[in-house]
Amino acid sequence: MKVTEYIEKANGSSLISLEILPPLKGKGIGALWNHLDPLMECKPAFINVTYHRSESMFKRKADGTFDKVEVRKRPGTVGICAAIMNRYKVDAVAHLICGGFTKQETEDALIDLNFLGINNVLVLRGDAPKNEAFFEPEPGGHKYAIELLQQVTNMNNGIYLEEDLKNAVKSNFCIGVAGYPEKHFEAPNMHSDILYLKAKVDAGAEYVVTQMFFDNQKYFNFVQACKEAGIEVPIIPGLKPISTKKQLNVIPRTFHADIPEALSNEIMKCKTDEEVEVVGTEWMLQQSRELKAAGVPVLHYYTLGKPNMVCNVVKQLM
């Protein structure tokens, strides 16, 4: 079932969804089940599986010189989506990114997803490679998320890269995109960022999932601004638990999300990571309760290695 169909069927009730990372290369499927098994108590409507571009590494050759090689540390998104749907009978949402993929590779991935009956995708530009300041597309790939989105909508209309294909099968993907309650860090201002989001919705995006935030008012303001811009698709809030003091610096730097002073003050008082987890869980619980009371369509949790914290919150919401 499509994400939008789940939302429509819920008839105003807030659903639960989860987001996971693929296991590192070399890890077996058991690593995924160990992460997901406890999370299934949350009764998620769907589970997002991230996609990551390859990273450049230098490997020493026998003569002492180095070769630059591209290594994908977390492969397997398409296979993991299929495995999740087979084991748990829960729909999976495959992330698609521009970075590191050609248009042909993207089309091949979409064909695989379509064959497997995975009908939900989240299209993203993706980040710049590590140690590089700016995003550069793969030769023959997409530079912007809206271009990737248009490729998916083309396939939904039976239009493939090989234009001479006759009577090509139409795919049936439900397409989500990302939204930024604190604006995308590359956008000059919030207004221009929302206009770009509106362009993606006009191009076929059916729902929005936000970047993590820790101040609900920023989400409410974002939703209102989107409505004023004519964006009428569901806007799903993304939530993440803080579990270590280190994240007070890592999250703003990596995800460009502010951490409220009240939250950071409480975390700084903690002497152990266990104490931080208690504070982080309570904060996310209060966020979740307020958002649920406001009638958000879905509460989307970035689990990122902390399934127990998410489970604790969801159990108290049930």
What are these regions (language model features)?
Residues 1-49:
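Conserved N-terminal beta1-alpha1 strand-loop-helix module at the mouth
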Residues 15-33, 91-104, 174-192, 268-282:
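Active-site mouth loops of central-metabolism enzymes
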